[in-house]
Amino acid sequence: MNSHSYNGSVGRPLGSGPGALGRDPPDPEAGHPPQPPHSPGLQVVVAKSEPARPSPGSPRGQPQDQDDDEDDEEDEAGRQRASGKPSNVGHRLGHRRALFEKRKRLSDYALIFGMFGIVVMVTETELSWGVYTKESLYSFALKCLISLSTAILLGLVVLYHAREIQLFMVDNGADDWRIAMTCERVFLISLELAVCAIHPVPGHYRFTWTARLAFTYAPSVAEADVDVLLSIPMFLRLYLLGRVMLLHSKIFTDASSRSIGALNKITFNTRFVMKTLMTICPGTVLLVFSISSWIIAAWTVRVCERYHDKQEVTSNFLGAMWLISITFLSIGYGDMVPHTYCGKGVCLLTGIMGAGCTALVVAVVARKLELTKAEKHVHNFMMDTQLTKRVKNAAANVLRETWLIYKHTRLVKKPDQARVRKHQRKFLQAIHQAQKLRSVKIEQGKLNDQANTLTDLAKTQTVMYDLVSELHAQHEELEARLATLESRLDALGASLQALPGLIAQAIRPPPPPLPPRPGPGPQDQAARSSPCRWTPVAPSDCG
């Protein structure tokens, strides 16, 4: 049986046809080209069917190990594509950047639909109170529009968290998305969906609302709409504004800033972005936050009090703004008070926010009025110069009065005691002023010492470190030069030690010539004069 006919799980026809694989060797005389051992469309299915062995139907009779390896690689690539896991670092970075952009767009769309739902809710509430009723078709249409925007918002929130889970998988190299679904993440997603799902549903639903009036303490019963309880929590959707600010912040999107923050163990979140904005433009942030909170709280108080305020004091928008303003500033005149627990709760939160904003305003104003470090240095320098001049003037006054006292007591024939007492008085005043200025100058020196903050100390330490590093480098260079000089001195010393021997050898007289010895004849002398000369003759001639 051919190894490509059955794989244990998928049955194929073994007859001739498009789906059949060749089981016999191809006939070269049939006029048809030889078929491949298996079709490309069945590679993934056949890859792990049986161990690789030579195929008898192969036109060349080669084993199928190479084809099986290629099938395994294709299976692995298919599994990577199916799991969404990139194949290398470049693909992972590109996929991560694309997920970042998709998450940013989803956050923008979620904020747009969330704000759209709030605007339509406020419009429907105001129109249903003064223009038409809750039973009208216009109210039903606006509520349907709110429900549609809420459904789209919920879908966008789900997609946003799906992108976040994909980013978690890419960053941590996870293969299963359920790894990222911790209990905390599930709770936060559920809470966010619950907050975004609150909205006034289409229809007219009422309930009995009982309250006690503020000054008369008389009970007040009214038939209120359920939309009041479902409309006010819609302002919780404004948390999406902080998410959009974070995702669009240059600090969050800049790779260099994120790298530096990671090295310094800084988490880039909404809190960090708000701190940065409070450092850059604190006045603008406080102004926008205060005005927004003021308007939202005033409208909420108006909606809460409209069913029990028969005199239209707090149910009027201007009256509600006055109540919120005096509560925000912690004044509390008492001319206007809320009747319902809803209005009292809003006023309580307004008072807490007002206390916090007041503290922030005081801190911001104090920081703005404080001199900078450069201004402090300039101010201290100018004060020191003025004090130095005043001390010099006081010393000159002391010398002048001393001379005048001496002049009017010793250099005149008849001293004028009144003038002498006058100059003595000025003399004592000059001495006292000089002593006082010296003490003031000492205090000024203490202020200068206090002006050296931790930043100045850190800067001084950095400068000292640079100086020490430079001195260390110069010291190493000097040591290298000294080592080179020492080696040269050693060589020069060795040369000087060998110099006497060379001089003695140069001035030594040559030895006297030796007397000739009688003996050999001319042939022996010729042989002795060239004993090492070689000629291509018999060896006996050299011996």
Swiss-Prot record:
Changing residue 339 to N: Increased inhibition by apamin or d-tubocurarine (IC(50)=11.1 uM). Additive increase in inhibition by apamin or d-tubocurarine (IC(50)=6.3 uM). Significant increase in inhibition by apamin (IC(50)=366 pM). It is a multi-pass membrane protein. It catalyses: K(+)(in) = K(+)(out). GO terms for molecular function: calcium-activated potassium channel activity; calmodulin binding; inward rectifier potassium channel activity; small conductance calcium-activated potassium channel activity. Keywords: Calmodulin-binding, Cytoplasm, Ion channel, Ion transport, Membrane, Transmembrane, Transmembrane helix, Transport. GO terms for cellular component: neuron projection; neuronal cell body; plasma membrane; synapse; voltage-gated potassium channel complex; Z disc. Residues 508-521 have a biased composition (Pro residues). Disulfide bonds: none annotated. Residues 384-463 are annotated as: Calmodulin-binding. Inhibited by bee venom neurotoxin apamin. Inhibited by d-tubocurarine and tetraethylammonium (TEA). GO terms for biological process: chemical synaptic transmission; potassium ion transmembrane transport; potassium ion transport. Residues 317-337 dip into the membrane without crossing it. Residues 1-92, 505-543 are annotated as: Disordered. It comes from the Eukaryota. InterPro entries: CaM-bd_dom (IPR004178), CaM-bd_dom_sf (IPR036122), K_chnl_Ca-activ_SK (IPR015449), K_chnl_dom (IPR013099). PANTHER family: SMALL CONDUCTANCE CALCIUM-ACTIVATED POTASSIUM CHANNEL. Small conductance calcium-activated potassium channel that mediates the voltage-independent transmembrane transfer of potassium across the cell membrane through a constitutive interaction with calmodulin which binds the intracellular calcium allowing its opening. The current is characterized by a voltage-independent activation, an intracellular calcium concentration increase-dependent activation and a single-channel conductance of about 3 picosiemens. Homodimer. Heteromultimer with KCNN2 and KCNN3. The complex is composed of 4 channel subunits each of which binds to a calmodulin subunit which regulates the channel activity through calcium-binding. Interacts with calmodulin. Belongs to the potassium channel KCNN family. KCa2.1/KCNN1 subfamily. This is Small conductance calcium-activated potassium channel protein 1. It comes from Homo sapiens.
